[in-house]
Amino acid sequence: MWQLNENQVYLPPPTPVATIVSTDEYVQRTSLYYHAGSTRLLTIGHPYFELKKPNGDVSVPKVSGHQYRVFRVRLPDPNKFGLSDTSLFNSETQRLVWACVGVEVGRGQPLGVGISGHPYFNKDEDVENSSVYGTVPGQDSRENVAMDYKQTQLCIVGCTPPIGEYWGMGTPCNASKVSPGDCPVLELKSEVIEDGDMVDAGFGAMDFASLQANKSDVPLDLCTSISKYPDYLGMAAEPYGNSLFFFLRREQMFVRHFFNRAGTTGDSVPNDLYITGSSNRASIAGSIYYSTPSGSLVTSDSQIFNKPLWIQKAQGHNNGICFGNQLFVTVVDTTRSTNLTLCAATQSPTPTPYDNSKFKEYLRHGEEFDLQFIFQLCVITLNAEVMTYIHAMDSSLLDDWNFKIGPPASATLEDTYRFLTNKAIACQRDAPPKEKEDPYKKYKFWEVNLTEKFSSQLDQFPLGRKFLMQAGLRTGPKFKSRKRPAPTSSSSSGSVTPKRKKTKR
């Protein structure tokens, strides 16, 4: 008896899958190098929250040592450079791009540990060295608790923004069956890391504003924020490798204290996991345990900043090419998170004797950065294959280079009116061309403009001298020695020509 073959037949894709290649395959590097550096970059604000005016405008921003600093570095268009060597590239078929070969992130300010806390922190019992079992918390048992955070140093370099991940509120399959007080549904989300986003402080990468309704389970700077962790897996798997040329990180943490939470335990401990007690242990104590983090010792021996970093080979397919004439540098440094305590007297002169009510205390946190780069000039030959590849990666690049890929021929019949100024017909005026939109305009970055900061005199800058030394390159002497020319017969009228010595043969 004939039977239908139930094995599935897999058909090949209708179009061939494009192969992702390294930028080294179509980018030719030149021998021209440039240095570019920022000015001293400073920011200062309140370490826990932003201060607002009565109309809602921000008067003092939130500036914490546990925030991401995402610098969007703007580079000049190399195709508009006035190069002395006109034979370097053909403007008809080639375009110039920058390749980042060196970077140094400078950090100012002394090493220090900043702490954070909450005046209404959800701390019930000390479960590390408990002396009393299962005290029943009152209606409000929150306490004033402070702690230091996990220690993190991080530097990510790419030509597109970095991606972060966190646990957020998910959508349940049947929303109608969700009751108040049910455990929220979790979903792993990936988003662009923006300047000012909070790092993982030791309480996990999550949306605290959505997942902690009491606003008391974490310190003030986290309770209404989203803590993001770099999505290293996602950025490493990116086909073109634009968001992550390389990264350096150093993380450390240990647990300082062990507590449990006050409140009704949502997931009760199963009865088969314990034997019922008696007396003051008849009711089982709370089992929502948690720990307070600590980053431990801060030392200059473990610093990853204030050092030159050289890009020989990127981990992805993009080997340091700055497409779009921009670079994104993401920095985290919690080893300089000291919070400054300021005090102002409410009366003048300073009141005596001392009275606490006559002084106001304030908190501020300041940060200092300096960015230095070494860029190499590169050439891309735009043949049909390369243009198709770049168009698939980012179609806006060809528009920036004044290359257009024509639309396919239309088979429909189009209308063309004879009299364009005829009031009897609809307006035939062409719509004005749309301005190019910034694909990252909805994100917040620290803008750093280096369009007028490029210099080919590498030996005039600290990072440039380091690059020349490690590359084995030497610059010519700045001052040429001037020797006195030898006298000639016409230089002095009284000169005597020496006689030629005779030799015997």
Curated annotation (Swiss-Prot):
Keywords: Capsid protein, Disulfide bond, Host nucleus, Host-virus interaction, Late protein, T=7 icosahedral capsid protein, Viral attachment to host cell, Viral penetration into host cytoplasm, Virion, Virus endocytosis by host, Virus entry into host cell. It is found in: Virion; Host nucleus. Residues 474-505 are annotated as: Disordered. GO terms for molecular function: structural molecule activity. Self-assembles into homopentamers. The capsid has an icosahedral symmetry and consists of 72 capsomers, with each capsomer being a pentamer of L1. Interacts with the minor capsid protein L2; this interaction is necessary for viral genome encapsidation. Interacts with protein E2; this interaction enhances E2-dependent replication and transcription activation. Belongs to the papillomaviridae L1 protein family. Forms an icosahedral capsid with a T=7 symmetry and a 50 nm diameter. The capsid is composed of 72 pentamers linked to each other by disulfide bonds and associated with L2 proteins. Binds to heparan sulfate proteoglycans on cell surface of basal layer keratinocytes to provide initial virion attachment. This binding mediates a conformational change in the virus capsid that facilitates efficient infection. The virion enters the host cell via endocytosis. During virus trafficking, L1 protein dissociates from the viral DNA and the genomic DNA is released to the host nucleus. This is Major capsid protein L1. It comes from Human papillomavirus 7. The gene is L1.
